[in-house]
Amino acid sequence: FDADFPAGQITCIAGENGVGKTTLVRVLCGLAAPSSGTITLDGQTTSRRQRRAACALVMQDTGRQLFSDTLEGELTIGASDASGEAGEKLLADFDLAHLGERHPLSLSGGQKQRLVIAAARATGRRIVILDEPTSGVDARHLDSITATLRRIAEEGAAVIVVTHDGEFASACADQLITLTPTGATCAREGDPQ
């Protein structure tokens, strides 16, 4: 498997269950080592530790990523400049400001998802990896998630999205990688489908 995940672009990874999407995410963000080959960043081979430092990961099960007692506290984990006015703006950007002092674990699934994506954005990491970021998100907030991922990419991050949602992938991907049991195909924006 050979792929590039360009800074400033959104790459969606799609494929059937069991083809290795989760394994690929784990390797990319440094939670697992590749079984063979290397992973490079800026042309340099990277260690797992370097990849972990470069990546912000949004897992599908967002409840496992909530650690603070407050919404703003979630934003400041790994991003000390996301408090005060910056934190309030970020919460407003994700339609969460009205939730005030609610405990993060008391939020709905879609609200938790938006909070964790906001926290990933607040880190300013070079690579943002999201596993099924639209799960639990209602249609009203899908456009907001797409716009946010676009903003994160425009700020210079490589955004990598694992999704089963073909419509979402079509709406936001600059590059689509489809994994199959026999390999992978890659289509870039503007390529014939």
Q: Model-found features: residue ranges?
A:
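Conserved ABC ATPase signature
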Residues: H103-L107, Q111
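Catalytic Walker B motif of ABC-type/P-loop ATPase nucleotide-binding domains
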Residues: V128-D131
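Conserved ABC ATPase "signature" region
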Residues: G84-L99
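ABC ATPase C-loop
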Residues: A120-A122
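ABC-family nucleotide-binding domains
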Residues: D138
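Conserved ABC transporter NBD signature motif
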Residues: G37-A53
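The feature captures the beta-strand-to-loop junction immediately N-terminal to the Walker
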Residues: A14-E16
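Helix-to-loop junction immediately C-terminal to a conserved catalytic motif
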Residues: C29
